[in-house]
């Protein structure tokens, strides 16, 4: 027997759309464009809505009779509606028991429908407050997370400072400092390695070549005609100066 196939509770992904949005199609610009935004009207749950409609439309605009006044307490009205729904449901049960075919059954169903519509309308009027409260809670959570992150960074910084101070305190007091002469030689060597960009006189060039020949004694010099002529010229210039 084969292994039992796992069945997902979710519907399968829409393969007709997944095949269109591959990485290659997106890279080549062949992926379908998103649909244009709706600007006039649209259908939702079988009802037509306008884009400029209010988020929560008044009951009168939907052709529904208002049972509560314009100025009211939401909490109190919701409790009244809940109690009215319970009473009308019990009346409907009594009608179904005594006279199921009576016209009062349809009237009671319409009353229950109207009560439920009003209850949902009052609940929907709380949606903006719920959205603001959700946003406030989300921002508080983000603020608390950022403060905790900053506190952890501060603790790590203090630990690093303590480690550096411990390393400094563990160093011996008689630690030899770098010699100034060696530092000077290193500086002169670094300076000599740089190229001079300003123009030089002929005497400076000749003197520099003579100094190089005199100081670089360890460097082997080729005994060819060119090097001998340079040495002779340097000696003549030295005697003239």
Curated annotation (Swiss-Prot):
Protein's UniProt keywords contain Disulfide bond: no
Membrane spanning stretches: none
Assembly description: Component of the Mediator complex.
InterPro entries: Immune_Mod/Transcr_Coactivator (IPR051669), Med7/Med21-like (IPR037212), Mediatior_Med7 (IPR009244), Mediatior_Med7_sf (IPR044888)
Gene Ontology molecular function terms on file: transcription coregulator activity
Gene Ontology cellular component terms for the protein in this record: mediator complex
Biased composition (Low complexity): 175-193
Region listing for Disordered, in residue ranges: 175-197
Name used for this protein in its record: Mediator of RNA polymerase II transcription subunit 7
Family: Belongs to the Mediator complex subunit 7 family.
Function: Component of the Mediator complex, a coactivator involved in the regulated transcription of nearly all RNA polymerase II-dependent genes. Mediator functions as a bridge to convey information from gene-specific regulatory proteins to the basal RNA polymerase II transcription machinery. Mediator is recruited to promoters by direct interactions with regulatory proteins and serves as a scaffold for the assembly of a functional preinitiation complex with RNA polymerase II and the general transcription factors.
UniProt keyword Nucleotide-binding, yes or no: no
Organism from which the protein derives: Danio rerio
Subcellular location: Nucleus
Location (main, coarse): nucleus
Pfam families assigned to the protein according to its UniProt record, in alphabetical order: Med7
Keywords: Activator, Nucleus, Transcription, Transcription regulation
GO BP term, example: regulation of transcription by RNA polymerase II
């Amino acid at each position: 027997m084969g292994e039992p196939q796992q069945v997902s509770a979710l519907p399968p992904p829409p393969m007709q759309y997944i095949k269109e949005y591959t990485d290659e199609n997106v890279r080549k610009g062949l992926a379908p464009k998103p649909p244009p935004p709706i600007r006039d009207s649209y259908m939702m749950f079988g009802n037509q809505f306008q884009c400029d409609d209010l988020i929560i439309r008044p009951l009168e605009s939907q052709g529904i009779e208002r049972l509560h006044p314009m100025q009211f307490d939401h909490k109190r009205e919701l409790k009244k509606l809940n109690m009215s729904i319970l009473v009308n449901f019990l009346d409907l049960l009594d009608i179904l028991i005594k006279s199921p075919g009576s016209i009062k059954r349809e009237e009671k169903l319409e009353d229950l429908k109207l009560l439920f519509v009003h209850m949902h309308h009052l609940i929907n009027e709380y949606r903006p407050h719920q959205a603001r409260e959700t946003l406030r809670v989300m921002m508080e959570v983000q603020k608390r997370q950022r403060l905790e992150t900053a506190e952890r960074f501060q603790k790590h910084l203090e630990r690093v400072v303590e480690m550096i101070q411990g390393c400094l305190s563990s160093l011996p007091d008689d630690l030899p400092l770098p010699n100034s002469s060696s530092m000077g030689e290193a500086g002169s060597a670094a300076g000599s390695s740089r190229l001079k960009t300003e123009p030089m006189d002929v005497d400076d060039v000749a003197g520099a070549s003579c100094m190089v020949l005199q100081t670089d004694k360890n460097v082997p010099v080729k005994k060819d005609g060119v090097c001998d002529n340079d040495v002779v010229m340097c000696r003549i210039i030295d005697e003239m100066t």
